[in-house]
Amino acid sequence: LEIALACHMRIASPNALFAFPEVNLGLIPGLGGIYRLMQLVDHREVYNMILAADMINSEYAKNIGLVDFITNSKDPINEAYDKLVALTHDRSPELIRNVVSAINNARKLDPIEALKIETEMFCRLAIKVKDSTQE
């Protein structure tokens, strides 16, 4: 689960199960599991998932914000790829990098710093858009 939490999006099959079983071994989730989970779901769900160590299904995971999409495909990897292509197909790599960076900054930095960086990104991109429309 910790690896999935580090991703920008999580796509699951209908029969996927999610859990933090570490507590059954006397451990807490590692590798940023708690921190990243707190960024996605309500803190009450975090307590439940970690202390109970119960498995949750993909539908419940989607309802609490842990999973973004549930795929019914026989080929979930390609369906996930197709979803990402559909989201980004007509966007420049620079735009995608800036969107991801701005979202991460909004989550991790103090608001003043995040807004400053976001405004700088916007201005850089706006100049490029203006220049490209004048060519």
Regions picked out by a protein language model, each given a short descriptive name:
Residues 1-93:
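Crotonase-fold acyl-CoA enzyme core
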Residues 53-59, 74, 78, 82-135:
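C-terminal alpha-helix plus adjacent terminal tail
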